[in-house]
Amino acid sequence: MNKLFKNISIGFESIKSNFTRVFLTSIGLTIGIFTVSIVTAAVSSIDKEFAKSIQSIGNDKIYVGRMPWSFEFDWWNYRNRPEIKEEQLEYINQYSEFITQSSMKQNYWTRASYENKASWLQMNGVYPNYGEMLTGTKVVNGRFFSENEWKLQRRVIIVGGSVREGFFEGKNPLGKKIRLGGVSFEIIGELEKTGSFTPTGSLDQVIIMPSTTFQRILTRWTWNEFVLQTSPDNINKAKEEVRLIMRVARKLKPEQEDNFAVNSADAFTKQFNQMKIAIAGMGLLVTGISLIVSGI
């Protein structure tokens, strides 16, 4: 027994004499383990959200806009690009061999209100066939607007899942009227809530209306893009074809650079993978430093 107490005493004396080293080793190991756990959890969570986003974008969709989807957003190089115009979509529909469906999509943030509640939401003005092109979500309550409602510029809207929760506290929103920028609109449909976010915005926080109605009530600047559908097998051919058609439609000379961007899920995936590598690299750096400090 005396020998046991003696060994314990020697151990405590050793710890006491090397307290700083033991302390740094413990702290270093703790930080290292904590960092690895946090980075692993973060990457896993991002992967799940990204999978939802990719589903919402669609692997058969092409998005034509003024700016590329990039985490390294260079606003100053893109801000003076000419707007995307509807007549350019007509060019694509006329000359493309790979595009099977298309829709104009106009975007604008506005103040939405219902009774004593208000929120800023994204308005989308689209064609009637946009409802058929939606991926990753669907109309789960009510319906999409019709060709006739589009032609007659009806004030009807389809709302994202979060709009129902925010304005109606889970109650059925169909038939209710929301004011957008002071103009009253009737809700005829509700989108399934996805929880996803894409470079084009969250479908949970969106209000969709006929593009004709959108253009009638909004004469100010809006952010426009084309949503084009093709076969997943032809996505790269379709992107290059659309790029060439857009150059003609925008009257660009051979030596001039593109003043528009042709985006798709694969480009977004590439950007996302680069971001994941950067996050993992930072985690490894912090872990490495902590292990060096701990003397391992």
Give the location of each predicted region.
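N-terminal Sec/SRP start-transfer signal
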Residues: 1-33
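Juxtamembrane alpha-helical signal-transduction segment immediately C-terminal to a transmembrane helix
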Residues: 4, 25, 29, 42, ...
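A hydrophobic alpha-helix feature that marks transmembrane segments and, especially
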Residues: 14, 35-42, 280-296
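Alpha-helical transmembrane segments
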Residues: 34-68
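Peri-transmembrane interface segments
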Residues: 42, 239-242, 254-287
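Short amphipathic beta-strand/extended segments in non-transmembrane regions
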Residues: 65-66, 83-144, 262
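Structural beta->alpha junctions
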Residues: 72-82, 113-117, 192-194, 228-236, ...
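Mid-to-C-terminal secondary-structure elements
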Residues: 129-144, 154-254
